[in-house]
């Protein structure tokens, strides 16, 4: 079986980050991020991971014509037939225009954003059964949820049993809270810098109490809502530097005035980071306890962009109450194509149990190989 899985959907016009592709050829797995082949983490002009796709064809010695299934995230709208024609007939030449309708019906599969997170975590673990929770900033336009949780079991025909979910319409969540905290500290969307800065700070109980007031609890609807009114930011086109270009730096001013900035006004940045991180840890553990209070599972898997935070993960490992806790090597969007591909492989009866893929396990860093001549050509 040959599978190509792409994130984001190359024909859905929405801006996404962490473009990646996974290809499976029988037992071989190729899974990689586009940024690693471009040398640029952020490229606002890219629509899909074309370098990673082409290198995957080379690595696995396959072509677009002999792919059994193409997997994409659920799009935000119905894709125009002419766009599919360009992609599959004109560009990749995977099929003919005459056979395109049948091709789309039989060979093109869609998986929702948070389910893809779930499958990435589960299939890269060695668990046969586990509770699992996915939390991020808000999915994408084809899956406008910020949380999904339930139980996943290899022996169940439907695989994943949903316990609950929270939609973006319910308001901002803990993922957005950490984003706002990061923006306040002047790091834009580089959340890892907030976590790093926290290691130099101290907990301030007064600040902790005031930050917690920004949250509204509604456990009957399985929701913690974060509220932070922010003023409009100003563009900064006069400061553009073409050699270090990132659109976000010129479309908004970071930080902006907000309820959060007023609360944190007289505190040191490192103490804001430390106190904010501790609150995030406490809120996340509280949610896990509430969502799985009736569960008898011994294992927990945490996925979604929120769990790129290693300090949070360490705290959960110690405080969750589960015997084993697993965090995938890429809990954020860079692992989505892998989850979608492995899900399809499982549904076609090709995965019997969660076996590791070599010493490093199944992960989204199984990229292209380069011989010595190719390396020399790159360096020269």
Range-by-range predicted roles:
Residues 1-380:
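Short acidic/glycine-rich loops and adjacent helix/strand connectors
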């Amino acid at each position: 079986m040959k599978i190509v899985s792409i994130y984001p959907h190359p024909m859905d016009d929405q801006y996404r980050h962490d473009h990646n592709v996974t290809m499976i050829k029988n037992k071989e797995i190729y899974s990689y991020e586009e940024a690693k082949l471009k040398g640029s983490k952020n490229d606002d002009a890219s629509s899909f991971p074309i370098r990673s796709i082409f290198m995957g064809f080379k690595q696995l010695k396959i072509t677009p014509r002999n792919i059994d299934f193409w997997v994409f995230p659920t799009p935000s709208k119905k894709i125009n037939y002419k766009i599919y024609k360009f992609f599959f007939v004109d560009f990749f030449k995977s099929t003919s225009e005459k056979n395109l309708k049948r091709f789309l019906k039989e060979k093109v599969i869609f998986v929702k954003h948070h389910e893809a997170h779930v499958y990435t975590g589960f299939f890269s673990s060695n668990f046969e059964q586990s509770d699992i929770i996915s939390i991020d900033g808000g999915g994408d336009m084809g899956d406008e949820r910020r949380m999904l949780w339930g139980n996943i079991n290899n022996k169940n025909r439907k695989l994943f049993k949903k316990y609950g979910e929270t939609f973006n319409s319910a308001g901002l969540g803990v993922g957005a809270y950490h984003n706002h905290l990061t923006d306040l500290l002047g790091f834009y969307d580089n959340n890892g810098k907030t976590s790093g800065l926290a290691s130099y700070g101290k907990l301030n109980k007064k600040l902790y109490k005031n930050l917690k007031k920004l949250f509204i609890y509604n456990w009957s609807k399985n929701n913690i809502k974060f509220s932070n009114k922010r003023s409009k930011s100003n563009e900064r086109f006069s400061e553009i530097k073409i050699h270090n270009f990132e659109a976000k730096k010129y479309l908004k001013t970071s930080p902006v005035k907000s309820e959060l900035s007023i609360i944190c006004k007289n505190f040191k940045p490192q103490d804001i980071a430390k106190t904010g991180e501790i609150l995030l840890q406490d809120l996340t553990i509280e949610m896990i306890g509430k969502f799985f209070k009736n569960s008898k599972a011994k294992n927990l898997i945490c996925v979604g962009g929120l769990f790129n935070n290693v300090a949070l993960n360490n705290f959960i490992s110690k405080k969750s109450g589960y015997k084993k806790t697993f965090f995938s090597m890429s809990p954020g969007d860079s692992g989505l194509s892998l989850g979608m591909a492995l899900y399809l492989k499982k549904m076609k009866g090709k995965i019997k149990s969660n076996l590791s893929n070599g010493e490093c396990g199944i992960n989204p860093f199984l990229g292209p190989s380069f011989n010595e001549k190719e390396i020399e050509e790159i360096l020269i």
